[in-house]
């Protein structure tokens, strides 16, 4: 599945656009698939912030706010917000409640007990 990601950086009026390609179609997504998509969104955000930097080797799903929201043209989008930027990916042909549950499980599974930052 190809997902368009629109990235908005704080203090910058330009909207950056990236494409994420994920091999699994949404109907078969697991929390692991959604975690991979969320991490790809965060890597795309890092690239927009500093195009010359190498991609982050490790990305953790914490310190961000997220929401699943209906898309104007059908389906839903995943929106992430971190301190310095926000990103929206989609649309995804899936019920909002289903994707919300997958995101919740993906973020919970990525938590590492005992690790603060």
Where do the PLM segments sit?
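Positively charged, low-complexity terminal tracts
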Residues: 1-117
């Amino acid at each position: 599945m190809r997902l368009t990601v629109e990235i908005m950086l704080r203090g910058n009026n330009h909207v950056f656009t990236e494409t994420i390609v994920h091999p699994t179609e949404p109907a078969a997504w697991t929390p692991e698939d959604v975690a991979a998509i969320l991490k790809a969104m965060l890597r795309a955000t890092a690239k927009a912030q500093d195009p010359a930097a190498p991609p982050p080797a490790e990305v953790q799903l914490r310190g961000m706010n997220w929401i699943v929201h209906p898309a104007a043209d059908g389906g839903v989008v995943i929106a992430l917000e971190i301190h310095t930027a926000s990103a929206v990916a989609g649309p995804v042909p899936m019920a909002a409640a289903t994707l919300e549950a997958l995101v919740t499980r993906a973020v919970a599974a990525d938590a590492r007990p005992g690790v603060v930052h």
